[in-house]
Amino acid sequence: MAKSDAPTLFQVNGPVGLANWKDYCYDLSGTKIAGDLTSDTYALKDGDQMLGIGYVIESYGLITNKTLLEKAGYTVDDIKSFDDLKKVAEDITARKDELGFSAFSSAGMDGSSDWRYKTHLANLPIYFEYQADGIDNTDAIKGTYLDNYKNIFDLYINNSTCDPTELAGKTGDDSRNEFLNNEAVFFQNGSWEYNNLVGDGKPFTDDDLTMLPIYIGVGDEANQGLCTGTENYWCVNKEASEDDINATLDFMYWCVSSDEGTKAMANDMGFVIPFKNAVESPNVFVKADKEMTAAGKTPVAWNFSTMPSENWKN
């Protein structure tokens, strides 16, 4: 960035990356691309300044087999909070032999699966702690909602396809295959799983599946959305010339607003972009996130990039 021919457009991965580069970042507040975001949740801010804009997003939550849920006597409308989820999961467990399926697929702690819990699930108590404290990063995570984290994980492992003593050896493939085989109603994972579940040779159609928020009993659960975020933020070098800055802003806006740009982002690059003119995705989980956001529900931001280290997670 200190070179004479430094780039005008660059990328950071989130608050931690921004901390290293924010002195170079142009304030994007009031720009056309900022106005085209579907939610300010996808902007990276430092105080009142918008220093980064997420340009590709993914969502994760509880992938839900609606068909099995209905066989158990419930619909997705019955699950609007942690208490609701707990009631449904424990009732399914109580009738597991009769129903022929479990509430949750295995929460395996093998390395192919544990990231779902020590990173993605752990994001929720951190997010709500940051919300309560009015911050988006910290030098010391307090653990305000660790009990809630324990409660949701206990719900997973005590209402699962397997005994908790078996989880150490369970893999990500095990969990997915249990879900594919109609052995569980809920499967914590993300929008990237869509092609593993729906399509040629797969057992599900779009009508069978949806994604629910991961409720942990904190915050405004009635208005909670999916965990939707990114580790890919566009930033503009404020040290560049005015002409280069303006040309870069025009290019960014073209990418997310024009027919040619949005089709290139969606079809050529496979991106889901958080902008008003985005090409419609066929992914049922992406559609669920879009519907929740349009209904005014707040996406849970990805704060796991602020976790101190892998050792801290372990």
Residue ranges and their predicted role:
Residues 7-8, 34-69, 100-102, 220-227, ...:
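A structural signal for short loop-to-beta-strand junctions that line the ligand-binding cleft
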Residues 89-90, 135-169:
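Glycine-centered hinge/linker elements that transmit conformational signals in sensory
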Residues 12-61, 116, 120-122, 208-212:
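Hinge/lid segment of periplasmic solute-binding proteins
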Residues 228, 270-277, 287-314:
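C-terminal capping/gating helix-and-loop segments adjacent to ligand/active sites or protein-protein/ligand interfaces
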Residues 1-17, 30-33, 168, 218-221, ...:
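Conserved N-terminal structural module of periplasmic/extracytoplasmic solute-binding proteins
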Residues 72, 161, 201-267:
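Extracytoplasmic/periplasmic substrate-recognition and gating elements
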Residues 51-55, 60, 86-138, 184:
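Extracytoplasmic/periplasmic solute-binding protein
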Residues 27-40, 104, 108-111, 126-151, ...:
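Short, solvent-exposed loop/beta-turn-alpha elements that line the ligand-binding surface or hinge
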